Amino acid sequence: MVIVESPGKIKKIEEYLGQDYTVKASIGHIRDLQDNKLSIDVENGFRPEYVVPADKKKIVYDLKKSADKAQTVWLASDADREGEAISWHLMETLGLDPAKTRRIVFHEITKTAIQEAVNNPRQIDMNLVDAQQARRVLDRLVGFELSPVLWKKIQPKLSAGRVQSVALRLVVDKEKEILDFIPTPYYMIEGLFITQKTSSPLKAVLEKRFASEDEARAFLTDCIGASFVVSGIERKESVRVPAAPFTTSTLQQDAARKLHFSVSTTMRVAQSLYERGLITYMRTDSTNLSSLALGTAKKFITENYGAEYSRTRQYKTSGKGAQEAHEAIRPTFIDNTAISGTAMEQKLYNLIWKRTVASQMADASVMNTTVKIDCDKRPERFSAQAVTILFDGFLKIYMESSDDAAIQENETVLPEISVGEKLSANAVNALCKYTQPPFRYSEASLVKKLEELEIGRPSTYSPTITTLTSRRGYLVKGDKEGKKFQVTNLSLKGSNISSSVKTETVGAEKGKLLPMDIGIIVSDYLKANFPGIMDYDFTANVEKDLDKIANGELAWNNVISSFYYPFHKKVEESITDGQYNRVSREIGVAPDGELIVAKFGRFGAYVQKGDPEKKQFATLAKGQLIESLTLEEALKLFDLPRNLGQIDGADVIVTKGKFGPYLRFGDKNIALPRGVDPMKISLDECRGIISQAQEKTAVNPLIAEFKDGEIQVLNGRFGPYIKSGGNNYKIPRGVDAVSLTQEKCQEIIDSAGNEKKRPARFRKANK
């Protein structure tokens, strides 16, 4: 009997091993720490208290039943620390006899690899198990002790983690860096010249930038009637070297850049390719290729491209904490240039195939040419550059970087030209640009940064980002429009200087990780109160200690002990100190003299106008942050309510509350669909929204259901309400029942639960 992690591997492995073997799947871990308690005996060496979750009990029962009948049990979980721990948990939980139990590992699902693994079994490596156990215990201690601090000081249901909180800090710090950035205008000068000998066009850029329109205009004025001459030509040959085969992080980065895959999509598709036996194991720090893969690649390249394109290379893994002796991610068979499968599988496989083959190809040789152009009336020089490919080498099949892409896309043949040749200026343009702020992190660039800082490991990158974006709502993946500036461009043609007004956009980005207000608040609090946890070096040093545990150099519980006691003391101090002041920022004073304040409450960020006696509220618009909100933007949020007219004799009013924009139609409140601008919506659009809401509530007494019926949103005689645990909860005014999520329902229930139970039929939720 062979036990693997994923059922997707069963068919292939059974096919390779034959009738004497039965393959079963554990479907990941079969036991873990309990969800609702610390589950760690701190007083006795941090001993974990493992349990079999309810959804794994049948799997454990079936595995034990099969194992008892088997002559030999082969534990074939994945070849990493998590996989080693899974094998150990199987051994312990199933009560396997060590005499008839073998541990086998393979890095690809091929007949050769499987048979070699069976022929070379080993014992479970307890150093690897201890390293995984140390990480699990450490992460549980951090999360279990820090999260309640956030619940008390900021808001319920928040979480913190050893890796996730540091990743959050990276994104938040980058956002603050961008907010502090002040765009500065400058002028770049572009010359469009004509050669004397061949009358060919030649574009060149002035090597100096000008700070103002006046300086740029003065330069163009001096160019009137000026002579331009080629003062120098420099040619320099250089080589481009192919990138190493993929590791987990470089695959995630390249798939994001070239295929626009999210990190989680890349890992899901790679898992499928691995289970189908098409690629090697997809969680690896290694850039090594096996001798068999090197030989196969050399043969393929020589036969298909020629011997001059082949160059065998063995790359050294750069990461200091690279884990077990995996290979890089590569096709199991280089000859398989294409595969069947989904479009995503085909695209990712093609990317992996090209990267692997390119890594074993010759360098590309290019010629870089720079032409210098002098003006007799000014000391500044123009410069024109061109790139010519002399030998394409690995570029024949694969481009890794933007530099490589630029070589092929911008390969330029300069006109025949010589030093001393005079040029005529067809036009000289002064283009106003702005300095650009730092780029925000994309999923892929965040993974790259985490890897550079040695934070996390291949198996943690994807779940960390998923936790921050999907489960916690600290980050959102989205676009930024950027700031728009009106600029004046100048153009010299002949002796005439003309001007034109254009719009220059600064800081526009697509598909980047954007911090939400709650993410900024949590990051700032943790950085101020738990600087050790949020320190990049601390998190990286933990990874190094885990590597030492895996190598048998450190005892795992000693590592935990040295961290835990100082950390626990700080947690206790934070719990007992004064109430954390929830975020509140004065924005300014409205024209009517009322103070405008931005705050963060139970239902998110909002602005408040006026004193407690007659205050007004408005939620922040999508993309707005408390930290960067201006007075002008805040005042626009109070332009609501808008009366759009009547439908069926009832007023239709667009307004906004703590819970977002909604329609007030008669005595009904209907939430606006996500993405609808309350300042631009028309009466006709409202008609459709109202009609849909009426149809849904009229035909469906059950509006929504969550957690297998534990939470229900229902229509009653007095309107929609929430039912949970035998109790009914009123839905706060301004909240549309149709748009409620499980999280929002839970917040309403929690809010009502904090009040003293009333004798009435309903518990009233806090407004």
Which ranges hold each PLM region?
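A conserved hydrophobic secondary-structure block that centers on an alpha-helix together
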Residues: 78, 254, 258-265
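Intrinsically disordered, low-complexity regulatory segments
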Residues: 1-136, 142-145, 306, 402
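Basic, low-complexity terminal or inter-domain segments flanking catalytic cores
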Residues: 12, 147, 180, 263-264, ...
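Short active-site loop/helix that positions an aromatic residue
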Residues: 12-16, 88-89, 168-178, 354
